[in-house]
Structure formats: C-alpha cells, structure tokens
Amino acid sequence: LSHCVPERKRGRQTYTRYQTLELEKEFHYNRYLTRRRRIEIAHALCLTERQIKIWFQNRRMKWKKENARATGTP
C-alpha cells in the first residue's frame, strides 16, 4: 500500500544574489551548457546539476518570451 502514499513535492529553490548573478553571466555567454560546464558551475555555486539544468531551461523560456515580445510576434 505504500504506492498509494503521494510523494511530497519538492520545495521551490531560491538562489542567492551571487548564484543568480553567476548564472546570468554564464547565460549571457552561452544559452546552452555542456555537461562538463554544468558540473563545473554546480560545484562552484554549491548547487546540483539538475538545478543548473532547470535554471537554464527556465531562463531560455524567459529569453524566448522577451524576444518574442520585442519583435512583436506572439
């Protein structure tokens, strides 16, 4: 019956200003990361690879929306 117990949802990750600044800086140079670079950033910022991957996915979507708005396409 353990399969009936719902799994707890992960809490929302909050990033420090330093982490956000470093991630934004990296995004400015590269919108896509290699696995090696993702590992390096994760170690440097004390985050998991998964957190870095998801942050970049979310940031690319934000960038895409901002560019669509700037060019006037929906």
From Swiss-Prot:
DNA-binding region: 8-67
GO CC terms, sorted: nucleus
Gene Ontology biological process terms, A to Z: anterior/posterior pattern specification
Source superkingdom: Eukaryota
Pfam families, A to Z: Homeodomain
Keyword annotations: Developmental protein, DNA-binding, Homeobox, Nucleus
Main location, first listed in the record: nucleus
Xref: SMART domains: HOX (SM00389)
UniProt xrefs under InterPro entries: Antp_homeobox, HD, HD_metazoa, Homeobox_CS, Homeodomain-like_sf
Keyword 4Fe-4S: no
Gene3D superfamilies documented for this protein: Homeodomain-like
Compartments in which it is found: Nucleus
GO molecular function per UniProt: DNA-binding transcription factor activity, RNA polymerase II-specific; RNA polymerase II cis-regulatory region sequence-specific DNA binding
Entry keyword annotation includes DNA-binding: yes
Family: Belongs to the Antp homeobox family.
Name of this chain's protein: Homeobox protein H90
Phylogenetic classification of the source organism: Eukaryota, Metazoa, Ecdysozoa, Arthropoda, Hexapoda
